Amino acid sequence: MSHQSTINFIRFTFVILSLLAIYTILIPSIRKGFFQHITECEVTGKLSRSSGADARMIESFTGVPVLDIFVKALVTSFWPVINGENPALSLLGVPAVASMGVSYLLLLLEARRTRSLLSVTWRLAWVGLLQTNFSQAIILPIYCAIAFSSSKKTNGFRPIPHVTISLILCVYTGMALVALPSPAVIPDGLKQVVVAFMVPWALWVFVMVFMASYLFPIEVEKEKSRRTIYIFALVIAATTHLGALLASLLHADLGPADVFLPPLPWYVTRFPSLEEGMASFLQWDYLIASVTLFLWAVAVYLRDCDEHVDWQRFGLEVCAISVIISPAAMAVLLIWRLDEMLSRRGIAKED
């Protein structure tokens, strides 16, 4: 199979993955009661907890009623993930949020090759907002299909100053805070505020990168910057996935299937609780989004790689590593390998 045939197949797969996300996430959420459970919690103003008193929902997060509708819905839906009472959901929540930041970073690096820093961070800020408010599994395949079709074969890594520290402050610090037990360590109200702050995380990253680039301009060594960014992305993607995988293996009442494998839509007639609905939503979301990012990385690698690819070896290698360290981590490795190859090609041309 030629590179171009594989790339065309992957483009078609992006469309299928987005439709699959609608079928497995959006339609069941509407028809099988997940959104209804969210509405019921908003009406009562309480976030349920099986042990101890229910947490009271903050009535207004932004002061703008239209915005509060979206924020309250997201806080409510993520409550089973962050309240610590559902181990499977809590374990899956970490790599699911982490992979969103990793996919943002890889897409940003690819777009940055041919566009200005302001342009790519602004565009991806809106993509991030759509992913957070709807579903990463629905939005990411659509964006990858459009971005890949409109992009051209490129060469050369272009540094993005301050992006790693921006992601740490806007995404991963909040992720660590909501993972703390409540109300013993962190109050329920503060945990809700942190989730609300993280809703427009991609917009905060845009603001931080833009302001830092003008207030603290620095000369970045290309080789060091490339290594730092890819190591950061790889560590985030691999450690969060491996941590959840190992924890599920060591947990007495859980297994990897309980954490990562979503239920088939036709086997579920109705979600009996908010927790069940969120589990199905998040499992499908993480699975489809991770596969999308992996396929996008394969397509970019094959498009820009001039070397001959041994399909059997390549397929076995990437699939085996993806199972162990996650498809998102494998995507990082592929784009990193491609960048190293392009760098060597550029040096050879100069010589």
From Swiss-Prot:
GO terms for molecular function: isomerase activity. Pathway: Secondary metabolite biosynthesis. Its EC number is 5.4.99.-. Belongs to the membrane-bound ascI terpene cyclase family. Keywords: Isomerase, Membrane, Transmembrane, Transmembrane helix. Signal peptide: none annotated. Its main location: membrane. This is Terpene cyclase sdgD. It is a multi-pass membrane protein. Epoxide hydrolase; part of the gene cluster that mediates the biosynthesis of the polyenes aspernidgulenes. The carbon backbone of aspernidgulenes is synthesized by the HR-PKS sdgA, which accepts acetyl-CoA as the starter unit and performs malonyl-CoA extensions as well as regioselective methylation and reduction. The resulting nonaketide offloads the HR-PKS by intramolecular lactonization to yield the 5,6-dihydro-alpha-pyrone-containing hexaenoic acids preaspernidgulene A1 and A2. The FAD-dependent monooxygenase sdgC then installs the first epoxide on the penultimate double bond. GO terms for cellular component: membrane. It is found in: Membrane. The chain crosses the membrane at residues 7-27, 62-82, 89-109, 126-146, 160-180, 193-213, 229-249, 281-301, 316-336.
